[in-house]
């Protein structure tokens, strides 16, 4: 499960909204919203990697967002 609250927070920190990030990913805005609302369960590894690069996330930030259920 993706920590979508942290993802949304990082988007805001980088001055990006859903529409801008979905455009940068080459994804339809509605599709991106659906993935956010499903706790990110439908994000592919490729999409997660692209998000990490677009938002310039550090390793710890990426782990906290995309691997939150595995990190104690």
What do these predicted ranges mean?
Residues 1-17:
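A short, Lys/Arg-rich alpha-helix, primarily the initiator
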Residues 14, 34, 41, 61-72:
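Short, charged recognition helix plus adjacent turn
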Residues 46-61:
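DNA major-groove recognition helix of helix-turn-helix/homeodomain DNA-binding modules
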Residues 11, 22, 52:
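The alpha-helix within a helix-turn-helix
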Residues 15-19, 44-47:
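Short, charged amphipathic recognition helices of the HTH superfamily
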Residues 16-34:
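Short alpha-helical DNA-recognition segment
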Residues 2, 27, 43-46:
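Alpha-helix N-cap/N′ positions at the starts of helices
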């Amino acid at each position: 499960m993706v920590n979508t609250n942290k993802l949304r927070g990082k988007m805001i920190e980088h001055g990006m909204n859903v529409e801008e990030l979905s455009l940068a990913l080459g994804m339809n805005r509605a599709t991106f919203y659906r993935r956010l609302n499903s706790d990110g369960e439908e994000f592919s590894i490729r999409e997660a990697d692209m998000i990490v690069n677009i938002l310039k996330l550090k390793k710890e930030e990426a782990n906290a967002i995309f691997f939150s259920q595995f990190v104690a």
